[in-house]
């Protein structure tokens, strides 16, 4: 009798185990699928580039401001990126803590209102670049922007500034650099001439060079694209971009901007 009872229990356990195995297998498969979905979502999650400006560009040249023109070019070229425009006149000077925290690359164009940017915001940007690897791209007159000067730690001044009808031939100095991928030499019919030397730290790379031609025919060299690593972050400075010229609508400049964003973005 006892033997029959034990056999019955063994048969019951065996049946339970057989019933449990498919359920456990199904649960395992479901778990793997769920994890894969999460991973795929993370891999496809949009990265974020914020294009900031101060709303001082003439509307006859830039109807949607300079940040709008740059953003338009980036949206056409960057896949898997969220492109956000921000302005000094917005709440939080355009960059809330939440936006800054999710920003992979910050593009900055400023001219007349550098002093209006809060020191608190500058400190937060510096921390995001140096300690957390956010990329920073400074354009033209933003050599005097407070975040850029903070990152460089130097006066960031040029010898002279002349918007006198000077033109420039821009040449690709390093064709193997990610910023110059697909870029050919090109010319701008007008540029505000920034005379060397440029009071910044020695760059890790000069990817674009320029040759100014003054109205009297004289020529003068000038660097157009400079790169640094500052802490954990990458920094790029681009010399063209005067507010009365249509530089940010030009295909060559738009390609450089898109390439620079991808180069400056932290690895994930």
Model region roles, listed by residue range:
Residues 3-28:
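Bacterial N-terminal signal peptides that target proteins for export
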Residues 23-39:
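Bacterial N-terminal signal peptides
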Residues 39-102, 261:
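Aromatic-Pro/Gly-enriched surface loop or interdomain linker
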Residues 43-46, 51, 87, 215-222, ...:
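Extracellular ligand-binding/catalytic regions of CAZymes and related secreted enzymes
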Residues 51-52, 99-146, 232:
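Short alpha-beta junction capping motif
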Residues 55-58, 90-92, 111-115, 142-147, ...:
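Solvent-exposed loop/turn segments at secondary-structure junctions
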Residues 75-77, 81-82, 158-232, 237:
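Catalytic beta-strand/loop cores that center a nucleophilic Ser/Cys/Thr
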Residues 131, 136-174, 179:
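Hydrophobic, well-structured mid-protein blocks that either form specific transmembrane helices
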